[in-house]
Amino acid sequence: DLPRWGITQNPLIYGNLLIVASQTSQAGVVAYDKLTGELQWKSAALSGNAGYVSPSIIKVGGEVHLVMITASMGRGRSASGGTVNGIDPLSGEVLWTYSNWQCRIPVPHAVDAGEGRVLITGGYSAGTAMIKVQKKEDGSYGITELFKNPDFGAHTQPPILYKDHFYTQYTINERSDGLVCMSMDGQVKWSTGEDPLFNKGGSILIDGLLVSVDGNKMLYLIEPDPSGFKPLASAELLEQGENWAPIALSDGKLLIRDQKQLKCLKVAQ
């Protein structure tokens, strides 16, 4: 069966591979030759329900791992079964699994926090967890949970990492924290709340500045600073609605969209 909200994952290009989150009972993740479409490998089925997470890449020591997150069964304290999986991107072998963070509808992909650290975030009160992956002498992998924090999460977009701090829009069905900043050790530094409200919109880092759609009509240019929210400019560019799409930048042109239109903005001199 198709997920309720459709197939929303992005495929991942890694070298000559096109990697997709199949999330079936036959294979959790599948890789194809990006030019010919020939099947290269498929992973084992992953524990947990199908979600909306795209596969992402992290580094563990000198190795590259593919990370895939699955959805939990149930919600709240009864949620269980969801997993975070590290996979060899060249063979599809599942290298490690972490199961102490649960989200019934996960969407944001895992974020590489450096030094083998992986940040995992979700909505529906799942909050965030950071783990550290290390290779053991016997060739297996150990997982250390560094922290969990219910006051930092993300409903649709992955957090942005800049100078050892994470920035995310944490407005979900249960709370309206707006734009939130968290340190590398899991301490929330500030949040905008509802003034201004940031509600699941896309963000991108450009030349050390945060460009964010507020999930509604506004586009913001923000200086990412752990001491406080520092907006530099804003403009009403979109029609009102649930404007949660990712932002894209190419050749000095910024692409944003609402429910009716796609806009291309020149942001480079």
Which residue stretches match the model-derived regions?
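Noncatalytic, solvent-exposed loop/strand surfaces
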Residues: 1-269
